[in-house]
A protein has these predicted regions:
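Surface-exposed cleft-lining segments at the edges of enzyme active sites
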Residues: 92-93, 120-125, 178-191, 217, ...
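Short N-terminal helix/helix-N-cap motif within the alpha/beta-hydrolase-1
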Residues: 127-131, 157, 224
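PAPS-dependent sulfotransferase catalytic core
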Residues: 1-122, 139, 143, 153-159, ...
Length: 320
């Protein structure tokens, strides 16, 4: 199918004129969402998919439409290498001027993919509430959803390092455990530090066959296998290369981070103890080993859950 779109071009006098351009279009919907986690490998994923011939990715990595209606500060100018990119960016401008969630127009942004696979990689979607998630999933029932999970201690430290580097978080004494905890209580950090809740929220509405959790641990240790698994799930050919980009290439890994001392690491682990155990139970997979990294017993966690369940049963029996 061909679509006609108005496009502004410059004539010989340097003035903008509106012309029509035609190009093949695909279904008006994103094929997938990547809903996090921030500092979980989402930039790596975007670069792998953007350079792959089976995918057409938006000209900017994080659209933020579902969480901020696109009203967000960007640190990098978006790509605009052809008319499809131009049309996409014009469409985003139109969406950002509206004060309501227009999922139909949002879906049409992805028509530029033609027969390829396309999606929205916005880690901030990990913070969406149940109402928005339900609306989005009901509107795009076939859409796949993936979540790149990372050990909460490591993820939070990486976010703090990025925040200081970009000037979003004031510099603090990174060797003082209690000062670090104060920064962990920053709403922008705390809301992104409970992957067990994020995954549980999305799983309530997404069909099991359309939802997958992947792990940052595998990006560090088995990037080839991780890339293959994600591409197969999304519908791409894992045997096709992502241009000249290798699976192990992760630019973010080389960026400067705050030095994490053993004392601060232990204090952060105490802060996230319950979340580490909740991740092991909710996410499974590589998350099962997270509590033991910090000397926590998962057996005691499940015993406490069982004890709470027994107490609840006795309480219900007493009420009846």
């Amino acid at each position: 199918m061909l679509a006609l779109w108005p496009f502004k071009a410059r004539n010989g006098n340097g003035r903008e004129t509106e012309v029509e351009a035609s190009f093949p279009v695909g279904d008006p919907c994103p094929d997938f969402l990547c809903v996090g986690a921030q500092k979980g490998g989402t930039s790596w994923l975007y670069r792998q998919l953007e350079a792959h011939s089976d995918f057409w990715m938006p000209p900017l990595k994080e659209l933020h439409y579902l969480d901020q209606l696109n009203r967000t500060k960007r640190f990098h100018a978006p790509r605009c290498r052809d008319q499809c990119d131009g049309f996409f960016l014009e469409g985003m401008k139109g969406l950002s001027s509206r004060s309501y969630l227009d999922l139909e127009s949002y879906g049409r942004l992805f028509q530029h993919k033609a027969a390829r696979v396309s999606g929205d990689i916005s880690p901030a979607y990990s913070t969406l509430n149940d109402e928005i998630i339900e609306r989005v999933v009901n509107h795009f029932p076939k859409m796949k959803v993936i979540f790149l999970a990372r050990d909460p201690v490591e993820r939070a430290w990486s976010q703090l390092s990025m925040g200081v580097r970009l000037g979003m978080i004031s510099r603090f004494d990174a060797t003082d455990p209690e000062e670090v905890v104060c920064n962990l209580l920053n709403p922008g950090v705390l809301v992104r530090s409970h992957p067990s809740k994020t995954v549980a929220r999305w799983k309530r509405y997404v069909r099991p066959e359309n939802f997958r959790v992947y792990f940052f641990d595998d990006l560090k240790e088995k990037p080839v296998e991780l890339r293959r698994s994600i591409l197969q799930f999304l519908g791409g050919d894992p045997d096709q290369p992502s241009g000249e980009l290798k699976p192990h290439e992760n630019n973010d890994a080389s960026r400067e981070k705050l030095r994490l001392t053993a004392r601060v690491r232990d204090r952060m682990a105490q802060f996230f103890e319950q979340e580490l155990k909740a991740c092991a139970a909710e996410l499974g997979g590589r998350a099962k080993s997270w509590p033991s990294r910090y000397g926590f017993s998962l057996l005691l966690f499940f015993w406490d859950l069982l004890d709470d369940s027994i107490d609840l049963l006795f309480w219900c029996d007493w009420i009846c």
